[in-house]
Each structure stands twice: as C-alpha cells, then as structure tokens.
Amino acid sequence: MQIDEKLLSKLEKLSALQITKNRNETIVQLSEIVNFVEKLNELDLDSQEITVSTIKGGAPLRIDEIRNSNVIDEVLDCAPKKQEHFFVVPKIIE
C-alpha cells in the first residue's frame, strides 16, 4: 500500500482531522513501514509450528489496579467537534 498525498487527503477528510504539512511528511514515511510489513505476508509459514507463548506456563499475570481516569474527557478534548460524550463527524455513508 502506497501512502501518498492523495490517500492522506482522503483519510483526513474521512476522519475529520486536519494534518499539518510538516506532520504530513512524517506520515508519508509510514509508506516505507507498511511496505516492510507487507513483505512479512510473503513469508511461507505453513511448515512452522504455531506457538502461543514463549514463556512456560503462559504470560505472567498482573494485579489489576483501580484508577480514577478521565480518559473520555482527554480524548474528546482533542476532537475538532464534539457533542456531550460523542465525536461529531460529517456523514460519509449515504
């Protein structure tokens, strides 16, 4: 997948985000990363045994910690348009 100015412009419109030009150049570099990841799809893994975990006994568990978090407010503060606890975006499906 080639990430170019045209694709970025389309994604910018669909996501209702505004990407600055200097940030735009950085995002175009994602094309190289995506191309590398696409090469991974070319690997023949049919002869490889499926593994779930490299740690004996599974992944170590962690203790759940209760934290007071205002994640919703923090995320909505970044939105160009919001209404109550929702993002406001233009209709894209007719």
UniProtKB/Swiss-Prot annotation:
Ranges annotated as spanning the membrane: none
Broad class of enzyme this protein falls into: ligase
Gene Ontology terms: biological process: glutaminyl-tRNAGln biosynthesis via transamidation; regulation of translational fidelity; translation
UniProt EC number: 6.3.5.-
Top-level taxon: Bacteria
Gene Ontology MF annotations: asparaginyl-tRNA synthase (glutamine-hydrolyzing) activity; ATP binding; glutaminyl-tRNA synthase (glutamine-hydrolyzing) activity
Keywords recorded for this protein, A-Z: ATP-binding, Ligase, Nucleotide-binding, Protein biosynthesis
Positions in coiled-coil regions: none
Catalytic activity field: L-glutamyl-tRNA(Gln) + L-glutamine + ATP + H2O = L-glutaminyl-tRNA(Gln) + L-glutamate + ADP + phosphate + H(+); L-aspartyl-tRNA(Asn) + L-glutamine + ATP + H2O = L-asparaginyl-tRNA(Asn) + L-glutamate + ADP + phosphate + 2 H(+)
Pfam families: GatC (PF02686)
NCBIfam families linked: gatC
Function of the molecule: Allows the formation of correctly charged Asn-tRNA(Asn) or Gln-tRNA(Gln) through the transamidation of misacylated Asp-tRNA(Asn) or Glu-tRNA(Gln) in organisms which lack either or both of asparaginyl-tRNA or glutaminyl-tRNA synthetases. The reaction takes place in the presence of glutamine and ATP through an activated phospho-Asp-tRNA(Asn) or phospho-Glu-tRNA(Gln).
Family membership: Belongs to the GatC family.
Subunit comment: Heterotrimer of A, B and C subunits.
UniProt-recorded name of the protein: Aspartyl/glutamyl-tRNA(Asn/Gln) amidotransferase subunit C
Organism whose genome encodes this protein: Campylobacter jejuni subsp. jejuni serotype O:23/36 (strain 81-176)
